[in-house]
UniProtKB/Swiss-Prot annotation:
One Pfam family hit: PetM
Family of the protein in this entry: Belongs to the PetM family.
Compartmental location: Plastid, Chloroplast thylakoid membrane
Superkingdom field: Eukaryota
Record-annotated disulphide pairs: none
InterPro entries: PetM_cyt_b6/f_cplx_su7
The protein, known as: Cytochrome b6-f complex subunit 7
Transmembrane residue ranges: 15-35
UniProt GO molecular function: electron transfer activity
Originating species: Trieres chinensis
Length: 42
């Protein structure tokens, strides 16, 4: 968390938590989508 605060000195905990959650959800959705495409292609 200290590293994040160094990069974004103006960010507070709520903003950082929301951003990390959004990034994680996007990565999870993309990986799930690619997995479904591979299953459908077989």
């Amino acid at each position: 968390m200290a590293l994040v605060l160094k990069i974004f000195p103006y960010a507070n905990a709520e903003i950082v938590t929301a951003a990390v959650t959004c990034i994680f959800m996007v990565l999870f959705g993309l990986s799930l989508g690619f997995a479904l495409l591979k299953v459908q292609g077989e």
